[in-house]
């Protein structure tokens, strides 16, 4: 380790001990070193003994900085790995840090764009509109159109910090996985690797710009969701320019009510937006926490969601969508056998899984949930319980499903915060059933034909020539097959002749031996010569 890494490691250990996080350590040989540190570094006492363990963990991660804050946010979504008293406080982590100098932000943008900001923008505000651990946002106007925009810029000093902390995380994960077999269930190496990929993706604003453009295209002219326009000419790896929007934050219930918002319709539209993204587009915003969701203040009787920060998105393939939809429908029809079979069919659990045992495990977990009225059942927690049960049957972690579960919990939480009587199942079931009908039966066939229509329109003019070539090739193939068959027949005849001649020759040789014993020497010699002659003919027959 370099001196810088050792200094950072000491800082991490210091914060952990000051928040009493050594309480998280199991009774294991590996835990002796931190406990020895606790005794040796006697001046580092637990300064928050009165706080619950989950809150202490949250505060420690917040103090350690951006990499650890985002790591805690990711861990809060892995409820298949962590109990509620740990995951719930982590969900409250706030990704807000002190802003850096606006003049430095401007210089960073000018370097990325290759010229003074005044060339393209007016009214650039040096005071940031918002500041987070990875990036900072400033406002301005486009000179050509006078359109208000926001400029998002990556912090100039963030990459070395991230690289150093990720290196320490990887090292600690390897140590834990190697020395503590019982901790392998938490998959520390895989969790850190997944987090590293997510975090590094957020450092490339080109990815966020592409995601926002795609999501905006998917909801063009939609009354349900609006995604601000991105200006790709002014966007690159470290800077992104997009349309500035004005809205009411979705968590501002008082503000929404004061604006006369139709809260029931707003909540239902949130559910509709989620299922549309998942099942129609196979592309969904996977970071829909309240800070990224606003409501258009215009037309409060017909409210529209506004989605920001598309840095994290999820995708599902057609098989995942079909199995997910069938799982939901089977769940709410209490067909647990079908749920178990779908998990095996999809490959989410091993093919040799005992269906009866799996069905029984799902039934035990889910029946208590369905004892409540449907309007009180959490879709997200149904999915969570399903994944937790499947993990006991060796279900591999499916990153796309983890993102889906996190997003569903966000959407459901927001929906019930807006309208506590929201019946998610009543809103979602018609959507799922219609989607399933579009995937099977006559309607699906018609859609498939429509999808392939451009291909057939291109190929139809070539059909006569293709048909002629096929017939010509078929005729040539038949002739070739006839030739091969005739050759095969001739070969079989030759082999039969050879066997016959060999048999005759062998018989004559045996006869010559018998005749010698009976003093018919001349006849015996003639018979032997004839036998050898027949052998020669049989050998020639085999050689052809």
Swiss-Prot record:
This is Probable protein kinase UbiB. The chain crosses the membrane at residues 496-516, 519-539. Keywords: ATP-binding, Cell inner membrane, Cell membrane, Kinase, Membrane, Nucleotide-binding, Transferase, Transmembrane, Transmembrane helix, Ubiquinone biosynthesis. It is an enzyme of class 2 (transferase). Residues 123-501 form the Protein kinase domain. It comes from the Bacteria. InterPro entries: ABC1_dom (IPR004147), Kinase-like_dom_sf (IPR011009), UbiB (IPR010232), UbiB_bact (IPR045308), UbiB_kinase (IPR050154). The gene is ubiB. NCBIfam families: PRK04750.1 (NF003404), UbiB (TIGR01982). SUPFAM superfamilies: Protein kinase-like (PK-like) (SSF56112). GO terms for cellular component: plasma membrane. It is found in: Cell inner membrane. It comes from Vibrio vulnificus (strain CMCP6). It is a multi-pass membrane protein. The lineage of its organism: Bacteria, Pseudomonadati, Pseudomonadota, Gammaproteobacteria, Vibrionales. GO terms for biological process: regulation of ubiquinone biosynthetic process; ubiquinone biosynthetic process. ATP binds at residues 129-137, 152. GO terms for molecular function: ATP binding; protein kinase activity. Its EC number is 2.7.-.-. The active site is at 287 (proton acceptor). Belongs to the ABC1 family. UbiB subfamily. Is probably a protein kinase regulator of UbiI activity which is involved in aerobic coenzyme Q (ubiquinone) biosynthesis. The keyword Membrane applies. Pathway: Cofactor biosynthesis; ubiquinone biosynthesis [regulation].
